[in-house]
């Protein structure tokens, strides 16, 4: 049994509103995706890391990746959605990956994954029959917006937060099971665990923390920079 990692990086990050794709934006003078790659590369149990790019990506080759060759392989098979990108990558690595091998899917836009959280995920899920993901219990009070209002966005109801968790990545599932799940679920799945759930399976939740944030909006870049600065101090 081996562990492999996938970093889907074929999207544009439209909510960031930047001039370049989100995964290539600088965080502490390093492309965001490189931070995600580095933490995975530091984990010796991960046999190989596959970075999944759009076939039309023109920025990857603008950077110096010398020294990464033994750990990183680039796949230019990204699709129109995250689910399509991950499924295309799973198909591309099927010849080297046994159906029982573990695949960890990690967001390129999560540059602050702590080493110990990655290790915790591997330790707790390696013997699980389904797989699992990093996640954090929801702490804030949640409000559901009313669907039809003429006077601005209004609260329709408060959503009980008991039992609610915020999904993070990596999300870790066996190659065969994840391939089956994504093929059956279609292209609108926003994370891998959702596809696994549609098979009737229950992924394990492995508690993480707020350092492992996803950079989604411009203000998140400053926070990610501060977190990385403290982690690397």
UniProtKB/Swiss-Prot annotation:
The keyword Acetylation does not apply. The lineage of its organism: Bacteria, Pseudomonadati, Pseudomonadota, Betaproteobacteria, Nitrosomonadales. CDD domains: CDP-ME_synthetase (cd02516). Its EC number is 2.7.7.60. It is an enzyme of class 2 (transferase). GO terms for biological process: isopentenyl diphosphate biosynthetic process, methylerythritol 4-phosphate pathway. Catalyzes the formation of 4-diphosphocytidyl-2-C-methyl-D-erythritol from CTP and 2-C-methyl-D-erythritol 4-phosphate (MEP). It comes from the Bacteria. Keywords: Isoprene biosynthesis, Nucleotidyltransferase, Transferase. HAMAP family: IspD. Belongs to the IspD/TarI cytidylyltransferase family. IspD subfamily. It catalyses: 2-C-methyl-D-erythritol 4-phosphate + CTP + H(+) = 4-CDP-2-C-methyl-D-erythritol + diphosphate. It comes from Thiobacillus denitrificans (strain ATCC 25259 / T1). The record marks 161, 214 as: Positions MEP for the nucleophilic attack. The record marks 15, 22 as: Transition state stabilizer. This is 2-C-methyl-D-erythritol 4-phosphate cytidylyltransferase. Pfam families: IspD. PROSITE patterns: ISPD (PS01295). GO terms for molecular function: 2-C-methyl-D-erythritol 4-phosphate cytidylyltransferase activity. Pathway: Isoprenoid biosynthesis; isopentenyl diphosphate biosynthesis via DXP pathway; isopentenyl diphosphate from 1-deoxy-D-xylulose 5-phosphate: step 2/6. The keyword Electron transport does not apply.
